[in-house]
């Protein structure tokens, strides 16, 4: 677990421009044979809000994230999302064009392994630029300028723009993946163990950068992590999962400082395995 000193005050959530939820999960469930990986999960996420989903390995948090982000079809329940026109749509009822819009424009997904979210053999500039081209930009000079600006924003020197991610360190790859996701100014970003596998010093630097970007851009985010320091630094609310169920939820500081459930108390005490 990342050992960093943090303020006891959670990030300040911006007042949402719309009082309707951005994303709604209703009674989500998924089973594999007799194994219930996720059971009866419901919650609402508002604009500018960051939700952390925490729990040990096998608790169901990654399965839940895949369903929320449209990568896995729920066995039961539904996921709804408020589109830019203000209309809330069920993901399962969206056409291909609407889903493509979400994945290219409105959503980002930061993988634990940057190689899953990057093209490792092409340049860093191309990794960022191709997402811009996917949303209709076609002026090479402007695309390169935007890519350069975003590399610098995630603390990657502009003189590395033509280098492939395979030449980058692990921390640089993760920062590049974040730039690739945020360059189109999505409204919602999904993060799956974004600091996993990184050295402690690299994790702390990455978390500080992520917290700044989330605040500056007013992003909504859903972050899956087993590291409670990540949850405390980034999230406004936290959901604790055990055995596929949400067993405790609330404001991050309240849950982590005064957990009610015995499982959450063990998790906070770092007794449970990652």
Residue ranges and their predicted role:
Residues 54-56:
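The feature captures the beta-strand-to-loop junction immediately N-terminal to the Walker
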Residues 69:
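Helix-to-loop junction immediately C-terminal to a conserved catalytic motif
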Residues 142-159, 268-269:
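Conserved ABC ATPase "signature" region
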Residues 164-168, 172:
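Conserved ABC ATPase signature
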Residues 249-250:
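ABC ATPase "signature
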